[in-house]
Regions:
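C-terminal binding/interaction regions
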Residues: 131-132, 139-172, 181, 185
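Metal-centered catalytic cores of metalloenzymes
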Residues: 3-18, 29, 89, 95-96, ...
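Divalent metal-dependent catalytic cores for phosphoryl transfer on phosphate-bearing substrates
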Residues: 38-143, 153
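Conserved active-site and cofactor/substrate-binding residues in soluble primary-metabolism enzymes
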Residues: 2, 22-26, 62, 99, ...
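Predominant activation on well-ordered alpha-helical scaffold segments within soluble catalytic domains
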Residues: 8, 12, 28, 32, ...
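Structural signal for hydrophobic packing residues in well-ordered secondary-structure cores
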Residues: 14-15, 31, 35-38, 74, ...
């Protein structure tokens, strides 16, 4: 089974830009929280989250086209590779998210971008971010405008969950690990 340590080792040579590393970490820790919600292996889901943008920095226009083979060669399970590929469903490929792992990654990828933007605006970072504040910012299409809200809502629907519930789970998971992805604020 893929460990977080191994995922970080695999990601290190491919993901070197700070903003992408921070994004990977945010997705990683939000995925851990989703795993806890679904009573799944937290570290495994974190590891998949850590690798979700494996080829993005080097191949942004061909994102996910250069993921499967190198990860397969590194011994990553097919189920994990499929989960990683599925977060590009409808945008980069036709690998539809089916499992809770896949649906969560599909949803959390964009969702964490808005959560991160909310946290960066606050003196205490994510530590005092409440779901209601996130929901207010989510409705403002100009805030974190590059985050695909339609995709997030589609993912929540796939999961059979309300946006506020998924956001709360992810915010709490990101709070637990706020220091590493630099979400602790300025105060």
């Amino acid at each position: 089974m893929l460990t977080l340590k191994r995922a970080k080792e695999l990601a290190a040579p491919m993901v070197t830009e700070e903003h992408l590393i921070l994004h990977e970490l945010n997705v990683c820790y939000a995925m851990g929280a989703m795993a806890r919600y679904f009573d799944e292996n937290v570290e495994h889901w974190q590891a998949v989250g850590m690798l979700h943008d494996y080829d993005y920095e080097k191949y942004p226009e061909e994102h996910l086209d250069h993921t499967a083979e190198p990860l397969r060669a590194a011994g990553v399970d097919e189920e994990d590779i499929r989960a990683i590929l599925s977060h590009g469903y409808g945008i980069r490929n036709d690998v539809e998210p089916v499992t809770n792992l896949e649906k969560s990654l599909y949803t959390v990828d964009e969702l964490t971008g808005i959560i991160q933007a909310c946290a960066r605006m606050r003196p205490n970072g994510i530590q005092d971010l409440e779901t209601k504040s996130f929901m207010k910012k989510f409705k403002d299409k100009k805030f974190a405008a590059k985050c695909n809200r339609e995709l997030i809502l589609s993912g929540c629907e796939m999961l059979g969950m309300e946006l506020k519930d998924v956001a709360e789970i992810c915010i709490e998971g990101m709070k637990e690990h706020a220091e590493e992805p630099q979400l602790t604020g300025t105060s």
